[in-house]
Amino acid sequence: MELLQDAEFDLESYISAEIARAFGVAEEQAFCVGTGANQPTGIFTANGGAVGVTAAAASTVTADELISLIYALKSPYRRNAKFLMNDATVSAIRKLKDGNGVYLWQPALQAGQPDKLLGFDLVTSPYVPTMETGALPIAFGDFNNYWIGDRMGR
């Protein structure tokens, strides 16, 4: 207690923020790839989720596959949809061009705003699987409809 009182900065707020950050990181990982055993089943590991598009190659994705992924989602859910992927997948996708040699990637016009891919926001997480055989490296959907319930006493 004395340490909290003698600190030259708000140590209590700092500790609270670090604990919240650590919980946030753990929850992000579980919500992406959780196994369902003492943690939520992640959106990339859920058996009930439908795969909209299967890539032709294990380590690449094409513009046509991204377009097919967008339209695999029912139209009511596309309006607020976003892409979710890891940085390695973003790196590969940033290099994709259309038939006229124009990049599909659209950087954000304002600081703090998400980048765009084919007109949709794109967010990243280090916990999304990488592009490899059998992996699901990209999610596209309206994540406002992804409900999370924290239960006490589990």
Region roles according to the model:
Residues 1-154:
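Structured, hydrophobic secondary-structure cores that serve as assembly/anchoring elements
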